[in-house]
């Protein structure tokens, strides 16, 4: 992907209502607005929440969200140009039970309260285990 394309995607990311790009300082200072309130303040329902860590382009997150409309899905990844694809596709398809968060995975304990998440998936770990 060319750098112009990447810059354009970063700009577009700022317009997506289903893509949250929290400020690292706010996360560290425990000022993240959705912590403990994802169900009511973001999804507006009490359905279970499933996280996919390292979601990349969000294909798996999107597939599951379409397959299970009574479950809320959140894909997390640090790469803005990748997560752009999932957020854009969800908007184009009108999928309401999915969100994407662009942040480092090691910060997730500051994004969610204890018991707020029902399942966590790491579908395609990177780096993958290498056997010698």
Question: Which residues does each PLM region occupy?
Answer:
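Class I SAM-dependent methyltransferase "Motif I" SAM/SAH-binding loop
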Residues: 54-56
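Short beta-strand element of Class I
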Residues: 71-74
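Conserved SAM/SAH-binding beta-strand->alpha-helix loop
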Residues: 79
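Conserved short alpha-helix immediately C-terminal to the canonical SAM/SAH-binding motif I
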Residues: 82
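Mobile active-site "lid"/loop adjacent to the S-adenosyl-L-methionine
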Residues: 117-132
């Amino acid at each position: 992907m060319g750098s112009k394309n990447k810059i354009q995607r970063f700009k577009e990311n700022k317009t997506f209502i289903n893509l949250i790009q929290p400020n690292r300082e706010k996360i560290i200072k425990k000022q993240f607005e959705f912590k403990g309130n994802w169900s009511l303040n973001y999804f507006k329902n009490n359905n279970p929440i499933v996280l996919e860590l390292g979601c990349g382009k969000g294909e798996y997150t999107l597939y599951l969200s379409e397959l299970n409309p009574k479950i809320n899905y959140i894909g997390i990844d640090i790469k803005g140009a990748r997560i752009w694809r999932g957020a854009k596709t969800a908007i184009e398809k009108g999928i309401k039970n999915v969100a994407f968060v662009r942040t480092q995975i090691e910060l997730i304990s500051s994004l969610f309260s204890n018991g707020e998440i029902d399942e966590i998936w790491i579908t395609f770990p990177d780096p993958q285990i290498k056997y010698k």
